[in-house]
Swiss-Prot record:
The keyword Hydrolase applies. HAMAP family: 6P_gluconolactonase. The keyword Ligase does not apply. This is 6-phosphogluconolactonase. GO terms for cellular component: cytosol. Pathway: Carbohydrate degradation; pentose phosphate pathway; D-ribulose 5-phosphate from D-glucose 6-phosphate (oxidative stage): step 2/3. GO terms for biological process: glucose metabolic process; pentose-phosphate shunt, oxidative branch. GO terms for molecular function: 6-phosphogluconolactonase activity. It comes from the Bacteria. Belongs to the cycloisomerase 2 family. Keywords: Carbohydrate metabolism, Glucose metabolism, Hydrolase. It catalyses: 6-phospho-D-glucono-1,5-lactone + H2O = 6-phospho-D-gluconate + H(+).
Length: 331
């Protein structure tokens, strides 16, 4: 299995393309100059395309991924109804979802043969919309509205339209600020990192009564931390054993172990990392974590090791200015 790491640096309008080897070392493959401030990125389910959100002209760009080395070639673009904050796809590669914090909306763009061709739906009224996350069954879109302390729930129709579910939302505690999410591989639990109080909520997707329930909230900061809380990103290993979340003020990554059924998180440790870590990701083997420092203009690679999933730095690499997003492709 080959793995490619993509990093987005909006201040220098670049995507860096890296080859990741089995020892956790990166080799630079390509630097792509992007027509705009590149921020969120996602790889298509079939691994053939990289979708990128850019501003100030709000668009999603599609790049073809070379199967031999992961290099990018521009394919097409499609307009968006707001500044892209987060981008994702459904599991079948039919739709792109874009959350816009500034516009307070989530949009659905239809894909045809892997390329964005048509804006299908836009849902407004999501103040501080920070991500759009499709459930493993491809039926429900979870959309955190950070400024409203809620996660809106939508049913995705076959033609790409979003309809409010019943219930239409779940709520966090006041002032939490839900931001990014991941799902457990067993499809029973979701985890949401809350930006404003730097906590992680564990959501049971369906309890014995058929209801969505928050079963745990865990502080992700050290006990002696007293500065402003500013959490950013969250990811889980493919085997569901380890979960990680980062805070930008403290410039650290919190390491969690996950119970076998996915219902309970335990803090295992704290890893100092690049200055102001805005985004990170985990490789497809669950062996390496790659973090981007928005203020250090570097990325760092960590090995995930042991029963606790603690991190050991393997190397750091200069990228563009203000790196914000990391994605990993395997093929």
């Amino acid at each position: 299995m080959k793995q490619t790491v993509y990093t987005a640096s909006p201040e220098s309008q670049q995507i860096h393309v890296w080859s990741l080897n089995h020892e956790g070392m990166l080799t630079l493959v390509q630097v792509v100059d992007v027509p705009g401030q590149v921020q969120p990125m996602v790889v298509s389910p079939d691994k053939r395309y990289l979708y990128v959100g850019v501003r100030p002209e709000f668009r999603v760009l599609a790049y073809r991924i070379a199967p031999d080395d992961g290099a990018l070639t521009f394919a097409t673009e499609s307009a968006l109804p707001g500044s892209p904050t987060h981008i994702s796809t459904d599991h079948h590669g039919r739709f792109v979802f874009v959350g816009s914090y500034n516009a307070g909306n989530v949009s659905v763009t239809r894909l045809q043969d892997g390329l964005p061709v048509e804006l299908v739906d836009v849902v407004e009224g999501l103040d501080g919309c920070h991500s759009a996350n499709i459930t493993p069954d491809n039926r429900t879109l979870w959309v955190p509205a950070l400024k409203q302390d809620r996660i809106a729930l939508f049913t995705l129709s076959d033609d790409g339209y979003l309809a409010a579910q019943e219930p239409a939302e779940v709520n966090t505690v006041e002032g939490a600020g839900p931001r990014h999410m991941v799902f457990h591989p067993n499809q029973q639990y979701a985890y949401c990192v809350n930006e404003l109080n730097s906590s992680v909520d564990v959501w049971q997707l369906k309890n014995p009564h058929g209801e969505i329930e928050c079963v745990q909230t865990l502080d992700m900061m050290p006990a002696d931390f007293s500065d402003t809380r500013w959490a950013a990103d969250i990811h889980i290993t493919p085997d569901g054993r380890h979960l990680y979340a980062c805070d930008r003020t403290a410039s650290l990554i919190t390491v969690f172990s996950v119970s076998e059924d996915g219902s309970v998180l335990s803090v295992e440790g704290f890893q100092p990392t690049e200055t102001q870590p805005r985004g990170f990701n985990i490789d497809h083997h669950g062996k390496y974590l790659i973090a981007a420092g928005q203020k250090s203009h570097h990325i760092a690679v960590y090995e995930i090791a042991g029963a606790q999933g603690l991190l050991t730095e393997k190397g750091r690499y200069a990228v563009g200015q203000g790196p914000m997003w990391v994605v990993v492709n395997a093929y």
